[in-house]
Amino acid sequence: MNENSMEFFLPDLNATDQWGQQLAQQLPLGTIILLQGDLGAGKTSLVQGLGRGLGITGEIVSPTFTIVNEYREGKMPLYHLDLYRLNTLEVEYLYPEQYWQGEDFPLGITAVEWPERLPQLPSQYLQIQLCHQGEGRSIALTAQDWAMDLKELLPPS
């Protein structure tokens, strides 16, 4: 793996949540997270941790049927998009860029589940691939045009 990729293991969903909370403290305003993994891999659990780390006290739920959930009560907004039920053309009409361009919505952290349905990837993002591994999850981080050192995002040993 090169300097733009890293892998590590989280032993359970609680650790995934804890890492999400840690991540929220480190990510800069305007971060786009592309979440990949099978159904039930822990994508929403990670976003729940991100929300807690941002100080969001309300319930954070999967936007599978609402497509987008917006949480604005934390230290910065959190936008959670789930594109699972949409095709590329439907995603294009959703205009997901509005959540990370900072023009129509205040900048925050945008987490996108099923990003392969995006008609075009953003120019800068952090991709997080979650894979089942027993009770835990293997995590692969990949950065695209990312200024931050990925080692800073690793969970504590």
From Swiss-Prot:
Transcription regulation keyword on record: no
Binding positions (Mg(2+)): 44, 113
Localization per Swiss-Prot or TrEMBL: Cytoplasm
Job description of the protein: Required for the formation of a threonylcarbamoyl group on adenosine at position 37 (t(6)A37) in tRNAs that read codons beginning with adenine. Is involved in the transfer of the threonylcarbamoyl moiety of threonylcarbamoyl-AMP (TC-AMP) to the N6 group of A37, together with TsaD and TsaB. TsaE seems to play an indirect role in the t(6)A biosynthesis pathway, possibly in regulating the core enzymatic function of TsaD.
Residues that coordinate or bind ATP: 40-45, 135
Record-linked SUPFAM superfamilies: P-loop containing nucleoside triphosphate hydrolases (SSF52540)
Single Gene Ontology MF annotation: ATP binding
Keywords linked to the UniProt accession: ATP-binding, Cytoplasm, Magnesium, Metal-binding, Nucleotide-binding, tRNA processing
InterPro entries: P-loop_NTPase, T6A_TsaE
Gene Ontology cellular component list: cytoplasm
Pfam families linked to this entry: TsaE (PF02367)
Gene behind this protein: tsaE
One GO term of the biological process aspect: tRNA threonylcarbamoyladenosine modification
Coiled coil: none
Protein family membership: Belongs to the TsaE family.
Name the UniProt record assigns to this protein: tRNA threonylcarbamoyladenosine biosynthesis protein TsaE
